[in-house]
């Protein structure tokens, strides 16, 4: 990572999360000419792999990590982001690699910790150690905004939950401590990525409509539709809790190109033009279609002490 000042710092658990959850914000911020930094906590070594061509990577941690790093580079280039790094490459008190902790499905759309935590797993890293590394980034970049997940990590993945915890601790450490290179810094705004429940359910219902079927070339046996009446993941919040919106359509091409870059993780990426409930769709390795909503939404997190002048395409909800 290279030194900058101001701007946006996004903190994510694995390669692909930056595009799936904050792609429009990153692309909009970068297009405004403001600096953007993406910090990724692990390399996704234990992720599933989509498709036969790359199936040999699944279970081969080092090979999958190297491949996903290349995917991340292409995705960030599509979003216009140049400054990026892994949390374990930032100087800390110990020399330690932070690895994907893995997960187990514990319900529909809900992840939890695996029965056995593998050696080097991110969830096993000391919280203060990881947070102080990130705090170094915040002090050196001095961003206007820090963005990460809500407290349950969007859907309960242990690395996402840990990333939220590390980010919140780092914001506090950056404010209360200096380091040998930078003075203390109080982050003005902390954002958590969320989705309004009603908007998400509308988008899920629209996935069964004619516009999506046309974009996919008809019904596909390898994909499933979500159940909008099922229990929603923790990323879904009451619509009146949304505090910030990002218009997706002006940067949709960049966001979809970023999703396509993550070929081991994301499939069936399509633009949708004829339905007001969504502007695109995709599926992960679970083969369940998901909507790209017209707006990417956020709520204010804890720790921020001020406000910023938002770029065009980003607006607070009155």
What are these regions (language model features)?
Residues 1-11, 112-318:
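Metal-dependent de-N-acetylase/amidase catalytic core
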Residues 1-141, 169-173, 177, 288, ...:
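Active-site rim/loop-helix segments in enzyme catalytic domains that contact anionic ligands
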């Amino acid at each position: 990572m290279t030194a900058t000042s101001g701007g946006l710092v996004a903190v994510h658990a694995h390669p692909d999360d930056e595009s799936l959850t904050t792609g429009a914000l990153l692309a909009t911020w970068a297009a405004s000419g403001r600096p953007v930094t993406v910090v990724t906590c692990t390399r996704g070594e234990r992720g599933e792999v989509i498709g036969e061509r790359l199936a040999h990577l699944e279970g081969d941690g080092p090979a999958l990590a190297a491949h996903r790093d290349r995917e991340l580079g292409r995705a960030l280039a599509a979003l216009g982001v140049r400054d990026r790094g892994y949390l374990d490459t930032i100087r800390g008190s110990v020399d330690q690699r932070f690895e994907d902790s893995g997960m187990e499905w514990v319900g529909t759309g809900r992840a939890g910790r695996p029965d056995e935590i593998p050696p080097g797993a991110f969830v096993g890293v000391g919280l203060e150690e990881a947070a102080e590394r990130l705090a170094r980034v915040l002090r050196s970049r001095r961003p206007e905004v820090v963005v990460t997940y809500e407290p349950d990590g969007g859907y309960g993945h242990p690395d996402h939950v840990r990333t939220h915890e590390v980010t919140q601790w780092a914001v506090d450490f950056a404010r209360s401590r200096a380091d040998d290179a930078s003075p203390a810094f109080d982050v003005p705004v902390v954002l958590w990525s969320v989705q309004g429940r009603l908007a998400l359910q509308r988008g899920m219902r629209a996935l069964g409509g004619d516009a999506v079927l046309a974009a996919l070339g008809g019904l596909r046996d390898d994909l499933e539709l979500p159940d909008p009446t099922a229990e929603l993941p923790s990323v879904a919040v009451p619509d009146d809790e949304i505090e910030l919106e990002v218009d997706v359509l002006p940067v949709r091409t960049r966001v979809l190109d970023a999703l396509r870059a993550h070929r081991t993780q994301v499939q069936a990426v399509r633009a949708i033009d004829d339905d007001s409930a969504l502007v695109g769709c995709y599926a992960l390795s679970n083969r369940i279609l998901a909507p790209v909503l017209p707006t990417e939404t956020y709520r204010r997190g804890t720790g921020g002490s001020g406000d910023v002048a938002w770029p065009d395409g980003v607006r607070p909800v009155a």
